[in-house]
Amino acid sequence: IGGIISFFKRLF
């Protein structure tokens, strides 16, 4: 899963 990556992509 890559939920954390998507979360960071939304922040930046």
UniProtKB/Swiss-Prot annotation:
Query: Where is this protein localized, as stated in its record?
Result: Secreted
> Span of the secretion signal?
none
Entry's Gene Ontology BP terms: defense response to bacterium; killing of cells of another organism
Which tissues express it?
Expressed by the skin glands.
Q: Which UniProt keywords apply?
A: Antibiotic, Antimicrobial, Cytolysis, Secreted
Provide GO CC annotations from the record. Answer: extracellular region
- Chief place of localization: secreted
Question: What does the protein in this record do?
Answer: Has lytic activity, but has no substantial hemolytic activity. Has antibacterial activity with a broad spectrum against various species of bacteria including both Gram-positive and Gram-negative groups.
Q: Which family does it belong to?
A: Belongs to the grammistin family. Group 2 subfamily.
Name of the protein this chain belongs to: Grammistin Gs B
Organism listed in the record: Grammistes sexlineatus (Goldenstriped soapfish)
